[in-house]
Amino acid sequence: MSNISSVAPPPPPPPMIVTPSTPATTKERPVGDNITTDECTWACEYPEVQKGCYLSRVCQYTPPKHCQYYSVNSIVQVGPTCGLVALSMLLGGSPTADDLLKDAIDQEYTLNGELFSAQYLFELTRKHMPGPAACQLHVGPLDCKKVKELLKAGGCLLVPYDADVNHAPCVKNGHRAHWALIVGYLVDTQDRFYVLARHGKSRNLAVWPLDTLSQSNENLKEFAQPKGYPDDEFLLPPGGIGGSLGLNERCILVNGLPKQVIHVRWS
């Protein structure tokens, strides 16, 4: 697949500052590093894939038609830095999320690490992308031929979505906005298309239906004070998260990464 060309957009207008409202907290159910099960044994040579499929109840007893991914080290976010952590994971940890945070603050994209603009994260991605790679801001549904073909060709995605209590995609009108890095895909025997994801609130590889992630991405329309940060102020792009500089129906496509795609094999 050829590199994606991109055209620099005009500089965005100054962002808005929003003030805090009400607190809340969530926790992910802890899961051991190793699992002993007769489920998903087709992926036993790929422990992170086996665990991800086991936890998501995907291809429990029957191998998928196809599965491929990049092995990416997880990084747990500190503060509301999910987008910066996702980008740092994509870049192999260099620059670090802390370095990206300093850059984002200098560019006036964020106050505390939050990124409620796909455009802002796209600008950071393009700035720090390694030589042979390219990126593009995608506008529209994720569940489309363009996105599927990019993943099949070894591309990755940076995707905003609403995260449920277990961090899986949900529909909350944007009130639980979060960022994930899509590192691969899986097609089951019923031809359902899944994505393999990393994000800053879990060390486990996540496995989500692409159509569910797409619906979550499409519903990002309203800001709500991020849970766990009741006293912090956050920057919103002009027009809010549902506007043209926001998160709604937007993601970042990346290809040409200098990484080896892992094709999951089974006997």
From Swiss-Prot:
One of its GO terms (molecular function) is cysteine-type aminopeptidase activity. It comes from the Eukaryota. The active site is at 82. Residues 8-17 have a biased composition (Pro residues). Its EC number is 3.4.11.-. InterPro entries: ACTMAP. Actin maturation protease that specifically mediates the cleavage of immature acetylated N-terminal actin, thereby contributing to actin maturation. Belongs to the ACTMAP family. This is Actin maturation protease. It comes from Drosophila melanogaster.
